[in-house]
Amino acid sequence: MSILNEPQGASAAEDSYENELPVRRKQPGNVVIKWLTTTDHKTIGTMYLVTSFAFFVIGGVMALFMRAELARPGLQIMSNEQFNQAFTMHGTIMLLMFATPLFAGFANWIMPLQIGAPDVAFPRLNMFAYWLYLFGSTIAVGGFLTPQGAADFGWFAYSPLSDAVHSPGIGGDLWIMGLAFSGFGTILGSVNFITTIICMRAPGMTMFRMPIFTWNVLLTGVLVLLAFPVLAAALFALEADRKFGAHIFDSSNGGALLWQHLFWFFGHPEVYIIALPFFGIVSEIIPVFSRKPIFGYMGLIGATIAIAGLSVTVWAHHMYVTGGVLLPFFSFMTFLIAVPTGVKFFNWIGTMWKGSLSFETPMLWSTGFLITFLFGGLTGVILASPPLDFHVSDSYFVVAHFHYVVFGTVVFAMFAGFHFWWPKFTGKMLDERLGKITFWTLFVGFHGTFLVQHWLGAEGMPRRYADYLAADGFTALNTISTISSFLLGMSILPFFYNIWKTAKYGKKIEVDDPWGYGRSLEWATSCPPPRHNFLTLPRIRSESPAFDLHHPEISAIDQLENVGHGEKALAGGKEAGK
């Protein structure tokens, strides 16, 4: 990578010697060896994205089995034991094997490009973190291969359900140690991200010129270092209980509540660990398709810092009904965390306001995220109130809220990010028509599945039950939810077809920025980038270096306006001094 220089755009990559060589078909064995031994952050990012998406499909299939079971009263296709394993592993897979490593995938791919770094700070540690995640997750899911099946005590493993008496199978032990393994990978990855952002920014890339996505990766990394060691310690203590009779989480000495405190001190920051990076993705996409810089850049960063700080003060709102927590404090802090989240909404809507909007597929997914996450946030404010929470705790109202928040953030923003950065990943654009078909089928299927679950919960249907009576009156809404869930599941098919069609027939991108209005630094290098990302780096004078590079006439006007404002302020100061 050269020192600062005025780049030649996409032609710089085309002029390189590598691009003059004849294109050869890679041997499958060479590809496998490359993936097994790589330390390139882009390849590792791709591995994270592919693996996490595979777990997304596996977790989704489990969800469809559960919805098929609940379509009608009576046991249809699963026993109670199988249903317990399904909801335990569905939650575990979606949160810790899909959403968390998906953040690592996007961060690995995009963050070094956005700060002008040639790679991450510790490439081999990066590779090690991925393999810890993969093998840890495989160990946890491997419980399905054991005689008594996988873990069946719910994904938050409440004591005493998770002790050796109530869950004697080896599936529980595999779940505990697999998640500890995988968690170490997440911790090591976050150390890498934080070090890279602090130490490896390009010349001119000050902290307050960093893209919002990079800021969110930094704060997410800090949250991981606060939350995941607590989970690892709690998991080892639980395994000591199960194997060595340590009696740490015995109900007789308050251990059941101790587990809840330890788990939720991890669990609530975890929700923001999987939310903040995807907020960052949306914050990158909306300005590009609004043809405007982000509204309130500093305020958006401040709101993100506030969310990260407050996220470690609200864990016991999961424990209102235990009677063992200070309700006024945790209720107030939970209401309070809605404020910076609301600030973010004003930033996003303010960016779109009076912008030159165009609804290409990434923008469509981002708009779907705004609508869905807003619904989830509103039901979160309801659950923050202890009297209302007492009524709907452990009901389908909580299930609906959680899916609106997590699915609405992670999955909608994931597809937005895929469609937005696919040219950067592969050098080809995903098909717009197929992308819109995927969006509308998923959007309708999702809301049909989970909107009605709010009413089911308010009417009293408990979560995690495999069966209900016809006399309960839950049948109609459950049937609607199940039909919609299969529409939601089918929405993945056009996306897979889109990937295949693009790979086989898509045209090669010849420019650095195929969207035309990209602002951050990844749009100032070729699609896909060279091994160390940049052949030349543009000068970084603002938080939109790629836009300044490709639209110098607009950046020149902005600089003149800034100089004019500065001169007026200076003159005003002199007058005040007189």
Curated annotation (Swiss-Prot):
It comes from the Bacteria. Keywords: Cell membrane, Copper, Electron transport, Heme, Iron, Membrane, Metal-binding, Respiratory chain, Translocase, Transmembrane, Transmembrane helix, Transport. One of its GO terms (cellular component) is plasma membrane. Cu cation binds at H268, Y272, H317, H318. There is a cross-link at H268-Y272 (1'-histidyl-3'-tyrosine (His-Tyr)). Its EC number is 7.1.1.9. It is found in: Cell membrane. It comes from Streptomyces coelicolor (strain ATCC BAA-471 / A3(2) / M145). Gene3D superfamilies: Cytochrome c oxidase-like, subunit I domain (1.20.210.10). Belongs to the heme-copper respiratory oxidase family. The keyword tRNA processing does not apply. Residues 1-21 are annotated as: Disordered. This is Probable cytochrome c oxidase subunit 1-alpha. It is a multi-pass membrane protein. The gene is ctaD1. Fe(II)-heme a binds at H90, H403. It catalyses: 4 Fe(II)-[cytochrome c] + O2 + 8 H(+)(in) = 4 Fe(III)-[cytochrome c] + 2 H2O + 4 H(+)(out). One of its GO terms (molecular function) is metal ion binding. It is an enzyme of class 7 (translocase).
